[in-house]
From Swiss-Prot:
GO terms for biological process: regulation of gene expression; response to absence of light; response to ethylene; response to iron ion starvation; response to zinc ion; stress response to nickel ion. It comes from Arabidopsis thaliana (Mouse-ear cress). This is Transcription factor MYB10. Involved in metal ions homeostasis, including iron ions (Fe) acquisition, via the regulation of NAS4 and NAS2 genes expression. Necessary for plant survival in alkaline soil where iron availability is greatly restricted. Triggers tolerance to nickel (Ni) and zinc (Zn) ions. One of its GO terms (molecular function) is DNA binding. Disruption phenotype: Plants lacking myb10 and myb72 fail to induce transcript accumulation of the nicotianamine synthase genes NAS4 and NAS2 in iron ions (Fe) deficiency, and exhibits nickel (Ni) and zinc (Zn) sensitivity.
Length: 239
């Protein structure tokens, strides 16, 4: 078997349980007069039926001068929470930042008070996050439903709007192409002014010379090959 540290005292010959006021005063008086160089031998020298470890803890946590009693302030509690996040359960290291406070006292206030507060705060924060997410989801769903309904209304109204626009466009086109013109050409001419239709006579009436008859016959039924020949013919007739 490996080397084991010998117990500080015979447990069968030591007293257990709470310290009495008489025991506490005897320990205080001895340490203030002689100091505490060796905790193993101190109980026997002080006349106490306690083990060395119990004497040391009683002195450090309750009897030594300069201990700060009473409840922790709000600033002390916040500092303990901050240091616990950095050091964990290293109570002696945390207690070194609190003059007059013991590591045992800090451990007790953490386990009985501060840890429960953090648990409640975490639960409250989680519930708030869930509520906010639910409200946000509900608001988003309502917004989506409203948007869909608006699109449906717009689409249902759009055919009627297109039909009305088509009717207006047809009316505007009809007005644009309307011409302020007389319904009949009779208003442009009197009956005496309208020329009679021209038709080819069945027989030619002869008036004057035979050359005139020849001229008009060729004019009505031209037989010239080209325009120049026709002009020459006209010149000959006028000479």
């Amino acid at each position: 078997m490996g080397n084991r540290r010998a117990p500080c005292c015979d447990k069968s010959q030591v007293k257990r349980g709470p310290w009495s006021d008489e025991e506490s005063e005897r320990l205080r008086s001895f340490i203030l007069k002689n100091g505490h160089q060796n905790w193993r031998s101190l109980p026997k020298l002080a006349g106490l039926m306690r083990c060395g470890k119990s004497c040391r803890l009683r002195w450090i946590n309750y009897l030594r001068p300069g201990l700060k009693r009473g409840n922790f302030t709000k600033e002390e509690e916040d500092t303990i929470i901050h240091l616990h996040q950095a050091y964990g359960n290293k109570w002696s290291k945390i207690a070194s930042n609190f003059p007059g406070r013991t590591d045992n006292e800090i451990k007790n206030v953490w386990n009985t008070h501060l840890k429960k507060r953090l648990v409640k705060r975490s639960i409250s924060s989680s519930s708030s996050d869930v509520t906010n997410h639910s409200v946000s989801s509900t608001s988003s769903s309502s917004s989506s439903i409203s948007s869909v309904l608006q699109d449906v209304i717009i689409k249902s109204e759009r055919p009627n709007q297109e039909e009305e626009f088509g009717e207006i466009l047809v009316e505007q086109m009809a007005c644009g192409f309307e011409v302020d013109a007389p319904q009949s050409l009779e208003c442009l001419f009197d009956d005496s002014q309208v020329p009679p239709p021209i038709s080819k006579p069945d027989s030619l009436q002869t008036h004057g010379k035979s050359s005139d008859h020849e001229f008009w016959s060729r004019l009505i039924e031209p037989g010239f090959d080209d325009y120049n020949e026709w002009l020459i013919f006209l010149d000959n007739q006028t000479c």
